[in-house]
């Protein structure tokens, strides 16, 4: 057992000197015993991760929790391995932190298997290239931005446009409809949201199929930088050992890049564009390349991406783009119209919206919807200046259908039922395509626009439309 001592503390960066010939490897976990106890009455040991070798047997480390009360000369023990976390069935339904410690107050996790958080990506020969759509039950996503099983989907949006609510609805739908296992990695987001998510998932009865890892906004950057890797370990176990199709939700991948920026600056590296770390692309690649399908199973990821100041060219979202198979762009303009989920049907793209993958019918309906909405967007300037009267009859029809389509893209969510009072809806892909096809064909031109707002299937819209017409 190698024992060193603390020689310098600068915030969350701690320098440790070891005896000659006993210097720990990069990424090794070091522990410091303290006399503190955590919120659950457990003895609190501080964990450090080796980040740099400074020479003279000194290593520079990054703390995974607060260094309050730490003093120079404190004894540091090298564990001889990276941070290891419990994986497998015992972790289902539990909430853990970056070190794999339970933080839900439900007692210890009795796991037999532990994985190191730093693991290589699957080899090229082990990766699967099969392309298949994953049904989510959300109309706008299934039709226009189909998710690929084992793919990576980014959810882009500024503050308050509904990223987290969509993520929660997806967890709910996947667990209930597919019985799939989900991992939720809360990376540097609000503690309140994490608490709400835990309580709502317990109420919805989907927690037993989910594992949660939290490293919230109040945690040190070292923790926020590594919590995504902890979540990945949990998913990798089920993919590799049980051959399962796992979903991992990362909220928010931007905070991962942000934590990397903080750690990089604290370690004294020269910043690159906009103050980001010079290793941004490398760190992002190491995380993203582990999220993939193998011949045994798949990991599909949905990543919420906060866009600073709504600027998609910022290095953090721009670097994330490179890894994604699909991008769901959430628009403030659509949210302002009261249309939720506020997915932009023209900006959002998916690699598998291809007739060879989704089929000719699905492809043509999706492109038809986009064509009508695009034409409506082009006509909006004319309408604003000259009014609807100046449009040709054909354009008037396009505008009427576009407004119906726009409203039909909205959908009541199960997880928002408590706030909206409207029961949530899951719409199958078949019903979804049929509904949009009927609107495009003009079968419902006689119904008022409001009939299409916040409904599930087209039958509901027709019923709602009849009631509105009768009432008027």
Swiss-Prot record:
Keywords: ATP synthesis, ATP-binding, Cell membrane, CF(1), Hydrogen ion transport, Ion transport, Membrane, Nucleotide-binding, Translocase, Transport
EC id: 7.1.2.2
GO molecular function: ATP binding; ATP hydrolysis activity; proton-transporting ATP synthase activity, rotational mechanism
Database matches in InterPro entries: AAA+_ATPase, ATP-synt_VA_C, ATP_synth_F1_bsu, ATPase_a/bsu_AS, ATPase_alpha/beta_chains, ATPase_F1/V1/A1_a/bsu_N, ATPase_F1/V1/A1_a/bsu_N_sf, ATPase_F1/V1/A1_a/bsu_nucl-bd
Domain of life: Bacteria
Binding partners and assembly: F-type ATPases have 2 components, CF(1) - the catalytic core - and CF(0) - the membrane proton channel. CF(1) has five subunits: alpha(3), beta(3), gamma(1), delta(1), epsilon(1). CF(0) has three main subunits: a(1), b(2) and c(9-12). The alpha and beta chains form an alternating ring which encloses part of the gamma chain. CF(1) is attached to CF(0) by a central stalk formed by the gamma and epsilon chains, while a peripheral stalk is formed by the delta and b chains.
Function: Produces ATP from ADP in the presence of a proton gradient across the membrane. The catalytic sites are hosted primarily by the beta subunits.
Similarity field: Belongs to the ATPase alpha/beta chains family.
Protein name, UniProt field: ATP synthase subunit beta
Organism of origin: Desulforudis audaxviator (strain MP104C)
Gene name per UniProt: atpD
